[in-house]
């Protein structure tokens, strides 16, 4: 527990953190990676170059400072980050390193304004925050390892099949090398993949949503070719090759306890966790009404459409596809789609009962737009769930 003086000092630093947060986190990463380059095997180097990771960390530090007297308020965020940490292999011994360089960065950027009292308060506060993460992540590691079929950290899998789904997206069917049964996962969860790319100094870790329902003898991911690792998966790995993956993680999951109508809204590769949710809901809650809305450029970029149409044979499932640039073949054929963008009128015509559970996945700008539209329908905030691919930025910062 922190004393009142420490809490008061930490809260007093919130305005300066809001002003200099990204400068501090940028300095933090630069200094830490300079002295500990081995950590580049864990952290996403692309996010470092795009500076999205420093923004996410700055948001987290500011939130922790603002809620330092009521850390329970940010436990959901801690758990969300904890899932990612467990998935990529963050360990307790990493936290003292992070704390050391965070304090160095605060002092470097704030200079004389970072008084001894402020630095001492932040050292104490970081210890409390780190303990919260370590405790939550310890439980997550134990659950991942001790569940039926579970394992610790990374395990070798074989690419049993590659299947092209669209112009940009290919599915990879992954089976464990030891042929042991796979642990169950919750629809909407992801796995981390660790690969060693030729001529790259460090290993690369990326997260991909599981795109099929639980209960299979494989895990499936459906990957858009858009970056160093995804391009390597598309072009550098073939059926029969081996990759390492961590056990499923993530809290963007389907709530089977709810009996409300289910509205799934996605765009592009954001369809991947939605396919898992759709199939799982049809299997486990066959009476639950489902509306599946997906936006794509056109049919050439629309992955997994046939699987959605197969699920839509179930009487409880309705679908709506939106193409912003349909091809002439799309217009001339018998495909059913709405041309343009998802807007308020479009949603009003589709969603008769707004008292539903909403799940949204896609680019940050898409999620922000859909969250706004769904909120304007009168939907309760706690009924709107979303998954941002990449560092966990706040919704307000995602565009």
Swiss-Prot record:
Task: Tell me the residue numbers annotated for binding heme b.
Answer: 85
Enumerate the residues binding FAD: 190, 206-209, 388-391
Q: Pinpoint the FAD-binding FR-type domain residues.
A: 152-255
Instruction: Report the cofactors.
Output: heme b; FAD
One function term, GO molecular function aspect: oxygen carrier activity
Query: Where's the Globin domain?
Result: 1-138
Site residues (Involved in heme-bound ligand stabilization and O-O bond activation), renumbered to this chain:
29
Q: Where is the active site?
A: 95, 137
Disulfide-linked positions? none
Q: What cellular-component terms does GO give this entry? A: cytoplasm
Which Gene3D superfamilies does this one have?
Globins, Nucleotide-binding domain of ferredoxin-NADP reductase (FNR) module, Translation factors
Please list where the region (Reductase) is annotated.
149-399
Its EC number is 1.14.12.17
Where does this protein hold NADP(+)? 268-273
What UniProt notes about the protein's domains is: Consists of two distinct domains; an N-terminal heme-containing oxygen-binding domain and a C-terminal reductase domain with binding sites for FAD and NAD(P)H.
| NCBIfam families linked | PRK13289.1
Q: Which family does it belong to?
A: Belongs to the globin family. Two-domain flavohemoproteins subfamily.
Q: What is this protein called?
A: Flavohemoprotein
Task: Supply the source organism's classification.
Answer: Bacteria, Bacillati, Bacillota, Bacilli, Bacillales
